[in-house]
């Protein structure tokens, strides 16, 4: 999965997919009442990027729905996975469940079209704080209450705070999650970060006993870093330059080892070598 980073304006969906991304990451900010409000990152953000692009969240969802609904004039068949980077740092811990409920209602209405031929992309809810694990139950309970438990097949989870793997496992246990887990690791492209925790996550994924199904690394903009990440065995790389990742994947060392994921590749099933 080549994951386009910080895609917060509708026009950027096409821009990143046309550069080679089959997945995008979008920031979601919340208002004081835990309503998802804007697709907005803010300052500071990755070096070389404008941090200030935004849409109203519901408008972005409608644009995303168009891009991921077969038959729509804006349809992009390659776009199969969307990571919502939930900026819950602005919320009190006791608002996490409420944020999950509201997120579910927004997605159901504006993205899934109330279960009637909505967008088809898989969705990852990425949460920065382990203490906000109740967001997951708020989300899953709401989809069930609204009569659409089947849509949970399209939803996965990520805790993005670079916490110890054991602590993340405990948070999922509390949230009642087993499966559909992506594990992120990384840091802004302005700084360097080693791959030791990525390797721990890959080992957990491949052990058959861990909680992780897929691993992604961010933010990967350079060819050398891309090679290191692929060599470490990640499933996804989040990038500002999808074309750089695509180029590296076409190099002799990789072109017979890795390929771009398609809609038929489940993002929840651990790839067995």
UniProtKB/Swiss-Prot annotation:
Cofactor annotation remark: Binds 1 Mg(2+) ion per subunit.
Cofactor(s) needed: Mg(2+)
Annotated catalytic residues: 41
InterPro entries recorded: PLC-like_Pdiesterase_TIM-brl
Record keyword DNA-binding present: no
Localization: Secreted
UniProt keyword list: Cytolysis, Dermonecrotic toxin, Disulfide bond, Hemolysis, Lipid degradation, Lipid metabolism, Lyase, Magnesium, Metal-binding, Secreted, Toxin
Function: Dermonecrotic toxins cleave the phosphodiester linkage between the phosphate and headgroup of certain phospholipids (sphingolipid and lysolipid substrates), forming an alcohol (often choline) and a cyclic phosphate. This toxin acts on sphingomyelin (SM). It may also act on ceramide phosphoethanolamine (CPE), lysophosphatidylcholine (LPC) and lysophosphatidylethanolamine (LPE), but not on lysophosphatidylserine (LPS), and lysophosphatidylglycerol (LPG). It acts by transphosphatidylation, releasing exclusively cyclic phosphate products as second products.
GO cellular component terms attached to this protein's record: extracellular region
Binding-site residues for Mg(2+), renumbered to this chain: 25, 27, 85
Pfam families linked: GDPD_2
Reactions accelerated catalytically: an N-(acyl)-sphingosylphosphocholine = an N-(acyl)-sphingosyl-1,3-cyclic phosphate + choline; an N-(acyl)-sphingosylphosphoethanolamine = an N-(acyl)-sphingosyl-1,3-cyclic phosphate + ethanolamine; a 1-acyl-sn-glycero-3-phosphocholine = a 1-acyl-sn-glycero-2,3-cyclic phosphate + choline; a 1-acyl-sn-glycero-3-phosphoethanolamine = a 1-acyl-sn-glycero-2,3-cyclic phosphate + ethanolamine
Tissue expression notes: Expressed by the venom gland.
Top-level taxon of the source organism: Eukaryota
Organism: Loxosceles hirsuta
Identification of the protein by name: Dermonecrotic toxin LhSicTox-alphaIA2bi
Enzyme Commission designation: 4.6.1.-
Record SUPFAM superfamilies: PLC-like phosphodiesterases
Enzyme class: lyase
Disulfide feature: 45-51, 47-190
Protein family: Belongs to the arthropod phospholipase D family. Class II subfamily.
């Amino acid at each position: 999965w080549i994951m386009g980073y910080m895609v917060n304006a509708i026009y950027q969906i096409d821009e990143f997919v046309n550069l080679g991304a089959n997945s995008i990451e979008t920031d979601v900010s919340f208002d004081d009442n835990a309503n998802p409000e804007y697709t907005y990152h803010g300052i500071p953000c990755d070096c070389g990027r404008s941090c200030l692009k935004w849409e109203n969240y519901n408008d972005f969802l409608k644009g995303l729905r168009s891009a991921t609904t077969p038959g729509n004039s804006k349809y992009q068949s390659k776009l199969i996975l969307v990571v919502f980077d939930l900026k819950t740092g602005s919320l009190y811990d006791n608002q996490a469940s409420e944020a999950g409920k509201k997120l579910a209602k927004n997605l159901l209405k504006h993205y899934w079209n109330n279960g009637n031929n909505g967008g088809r992309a898989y969705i990852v809810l990425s949460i920065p704080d382990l203490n906000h694990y109740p967001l997951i139950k708020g989300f899953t309970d709401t989809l069930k209450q609204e009569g659409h438990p089947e849509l949970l097949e399209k939803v996965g989870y990520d805790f993005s705070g670079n916490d110890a793997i054991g602590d993340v496992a405990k948070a999922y246990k509390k949230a009642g999650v087993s499966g559909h887990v992506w594990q992120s690791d990384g840091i802004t492209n302005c700084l360097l970060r080693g791959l030791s925790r990525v390797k721990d996550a890959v080992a957990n994924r491949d052990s058959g006993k861990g909680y992780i199904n897929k691993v992604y690394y961010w933010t990967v903009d350079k060819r050398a870093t891309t090679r290191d990440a692929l060599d470490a065995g990640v499933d996804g790389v989040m990038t500002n330059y999808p074309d750089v990742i695509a180029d590296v994947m076409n190099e002799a060392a990789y072109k017979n080892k890795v390929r771009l994921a398609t809609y038929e590749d489940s993002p929840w099933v651990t790839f067995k070598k």
